[in-house]
Amino acid sequence: MKKSFLLLPLSLVVLSACTSNFPAPISDADGNFSPSVIQSVNGSNVGGAWQPEIQKNSLPTTGNMVTPQQNFQPINQQPTMPTAPAQPAFQPSPKTVVSAPTVQTKTVTKTVADCVDGQHINIPRNPNTNAPDYSKISKGSYKGNTYKVNKGDTMFLIAYLAGIDVKELAALNNLSEPYNLSLGQVLKISNCDIKTVTTTVSVKQPAVTASTATPVKPAVTYTPGANGTQIGSDGTIIGPIKSEAGTSPSVPVATSSTQVTSSVNNANSTPINSNVVAPIASNVVWQWPTSGNIIQGFSSTDGGNKGIDISGSRGQAVKAAAAGRIVYAGNALRGYGNLIIIKHNDDFLSAYAHNDKILVADQQEVKAGQDIAKMGSSGTNTVKLHFEIRYKGKSVDPVRYLPRH
């Protein structure tokens, strides 16, 4: 009980010290006292409650803010470019077009007849008799394909203008003597120049598809085999093969993969001149009109031989070179002697001159190889046959149509 009374005064002293207006001194770790950092909010409010004053410091701005650096090691790595997703490889279907259509050119050479449908011509005439003045007319000056008969024209005049014989003109128009002409009548002349025309044309090649493309076969190589044979890489065997007794030797047959090239030496073959104009295609089957040697060949020059001369003996048979109809048989044309003209079709005529005797008549149908005359020397000084082939009224080389001996 005494202890309780003793402690009571001590407690009051402590309480009175805590409620004083002055803060208690604070001692630091060294035991030195220092005034308190807590100050009143308002100096006049001495009696108010004490609150600690929070000193406001402005935060640094973003620009002045120091960012702590992180410690890292740079990695040497090349930048990678973004790549597109891989596309699947294109595989063409069997019908897919592999190549586009192409255009190629090729050279075409053909023999054509250069004809003029009609031609206006002034014929110099005698003012008194209206007869043609041949001294002022050039033979063959008319180049038309047809001719319209004018007043005073004769068959001789028209043939002279066209540069052909009267009988040929009559044969072309199916006329017979005495050749009566009417004003305005149109005669077929067929005075065409035969020439070779070379042109270049474009050929469009179709597109090649996988389904239509033809695979290229590998080249066939050969190795020596037994008995002189050659064994091909494709299994074919060529060369001599010894046959067994009682059997026939097999004949090698060329397959599609083997190309057989043969060289034939013909002592009688005649070299072909590449500069000679190719013959015009003919549906007439020709044969030699007689046997013998050619003593004078064809010439296309002015004044040249318009056919071939074949030697022979008097009375030797002269035959029709092809089937046709006799359109002239006589000796009215000077320089030809006994002459026969055969019309084979609308394009081709053949002529047989200098005959000793004529065995056929005008308008007679003859067969190829039929005897039509006997060889002679009429109109010339030697026994021979002068033979001509005419295409559309123009002389062509008979040798290029006749079969080789």
Swiss-Prot record:
It comes from the Bacteria. A lipid is attached at residue 18 (N-palmitoyl cysteine). GO terms for cellular component: cell division site; cell outer membrane. Keywords: Cell outer membrane, Lipoprotein, Membrane, Palmitate, Signal, Virulence. It is a lipid-anchor. Residues 81-94 have a biased composition (Low complexity). CDD domains: LysM, M23_peptidase. Residues 1-17 form the signal peptide. It is found in: Cell outer membrane. One of its GO terms (molecular function) is metalloendopeptidase activity. A lipid is attached at residue 18 (S-diacylglycerol cysteine). Residues 81-102 are annotated as: Disordered. Residues 145-189 form the LysM domain. It holds the Pfam family Peptidase_M23. Belongs to the E.coli NlpD/Haemophilus LppB family. May be a virulence determinant. This is Outer membrane antigenic lipoprotein B. It comes from Haemophilus influenzae (strain ATCC 51907 / DSM 11121 / KW20 / Rd). The lineage of its organism: Bacteria, Pseudomonadati, Pseudomonadota, Gammaproteobacteria, Pasteurellales.
